[in-house]
Regions:
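A short beta-strand motif characteristic of beta-propeller blades
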Residues: 14-19, 56-64, 99-105, 148-155, ...
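Beta-propeller blade signature
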Residues: 90, 135-145, 188-203, 238-245, ...
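Blade-level signature of beta-propeller repeat domains, shared across WD40, Kelch, NHL, RCC1
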Residues: 260-318
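Conserved blade-ending motifs and adjacent loop-strand segments that build the rim/top face
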Residues: 204-221, 247-270, 301-309
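Solvent-exposed, low-complexity, intrinsically disordered
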Residues: 335-359
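Bacterial Sec-dependent N-terminal signal peptides
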Residues: 1-29, 121-123, 305-338
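Conserved short beta-strand element of beta-propeller blades
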Residues: 20-40, 63-83, 90, 104-125, ...
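Short glycine/acidic-enriched loop and turn motifs that connect beta-strands
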Residues: 44-46, 87-89, 128-132, 180-184, ...
Length: 359
């Protein structure tokens, strides 16, 4: 009897996509403002509780699917919005209808920008377009249905970027890594290796640190925030950025890290961690799972943010200069020992001295 109860409780924490649709979702978004999951297929958009209950479904025509396919889903006051990933278009799902509400035009100037909500506004930072990377914020005001540019005071700004890791905690927007454009060859990009923080109330930027340890860090839906740390995977290893001391940490690996579905979200809720895994036997067997020990990620070691190679080069260079200076002074001292000094009553060679009697 006890075994049956345990099995029932276990399967209640799994949500098989076959219950939602015969199609595997093209994308899944976790909407923290509403604590719901949004599944998108070519035929419908489905809303569910994290535990699996379906709370809403919107059938899509071919035209509607094209409108929301390349979009990021957000929510304000339980109303869902779909923000075009390239820039411009905003669609709203309300009262079982999908409608475009923005008064802007479609463009491709903010591809791979960071999209988030703050105080009932939809923000996006950075993005790539027309051989350039943006370093400013735009926001969509749901009152006027217009995109506006965020105006800030003159200050030191991060380089223009796109495809950055990002997250919002309280009044701060954090940006980690990403890519930027080579100013001398705008057909090429290179990875950024820095961490910046923007105060969304004061409108001020703060450069937190630079790092050399990671070759590149870019956006992933597997990134998540939990217990004042930002967690992410890199080369099948779990890491965290600690917000309390602004350091990177290597974490003991999550047991199922190799089975995580890369384009589906990981998120924490009610002290639990939720994640998607796929079966190696059948592609359709994808489930959302609950890990009840969200606070038990152990730190293996703290990551040095700078490459030790540069430090070694500096030390070797310093020692070389000291050696050259010592060698120079030593030669000078030996040379001085060979000089004969003739005085009125003596002849001196180094420490040797010959007295001269005056006749």
């Amino acid at each position: 009897m006890i075994i049956c109860f345990i099995l029932i409780m276990f399967f209640q924490s799994l949500l098989n996509f076959e219950e939602l649709t015969t199609e595997i979702p093209l994308s899944v978004d976790y909407i923290p403002a509403s604590e719901v999951l949004l599944y998108k297929t070519s035929k419908s958009i489905t809303l569910t509780r994290v535990e699996g209950q379906i709370i809403g479904k919107l059938p899509l025509t071919v035209n509607q699917f094209e409108q929301v396919n390349n979009s990021v889903a957000v929510a304000i006051d339980s109303i869902f919005y779909f923000i075009n990933e390239n820039g411009g278009f905003v669609y709203r799902w309300h009262n079982d209808e999908l409608e475009r509400i923005d008064n802007s035009y479609g463009h491709r100037s903010q591809m791979m920008s960071s999209i988030f909500t703050y105080e009932k506004k939809i923000y996006r930072h950075g993005g790539y377009g027309f051989f350039d990377a943006r370093n400013f914020f735009t926001f969509f005001d749901i009152e006027s249905n217009e995109w506006e540019v965020e105006i800030i005071d003159e200050q030191i700004l991060p380089l223009g970027s796109f495809d950055s890791k990002f997250f919002v905690v309280e009044n701060y927007f954090y940006k980690i890594g990403g890519e930027t454009i080579d100013p001398f060859d705008r057909t090429k990009s290179y990875p950024l290796k820095d961490v910046w923080r923007f105060n969304l109330k004061d409108k001020t930027w703060e450069h937190l640190l630079d790092f050399d340890y990671f070759e590149t860090l870019t956006f992933s839906k597997n990134d998540f925030v939990m217990n004042n740390k930002f967690y992410f995977t890199n080369q099948n290893q779990l890491y965290a950025f600690n917000l309390e001391n602004n350091t990177f940490e290597q974490i003991e690996n999550f047991p199922l890290i190799e089975k995580l579905v890369k384009n589906y979200p990981i998120f924490s809720k009610d002290a639990n961690l939720f994640y998607f895994t796929s079966s190696s036997n059948e592609e359709k067997q994808i489930s959302v799972n609950k890990h009840s020990k969200a606070g038990n990620f152990k730190v293996e070691r703290q990551i040095s943010t700078h490459d030790n190679t540069s430090l070694i080069i500096w030390i070797v260079g310093f020692l070389t200069v000291i050696l050259i200076a010592f060698n120079f002074l030593n030669k000078k001292r030996k040379k001085e020992k060979k000089i004969i000094f003739v005085k009125s009553n003596s002849i001196n060679l180094g420490k040797k001295k010959i007295e001269i009697d005056v006749i």
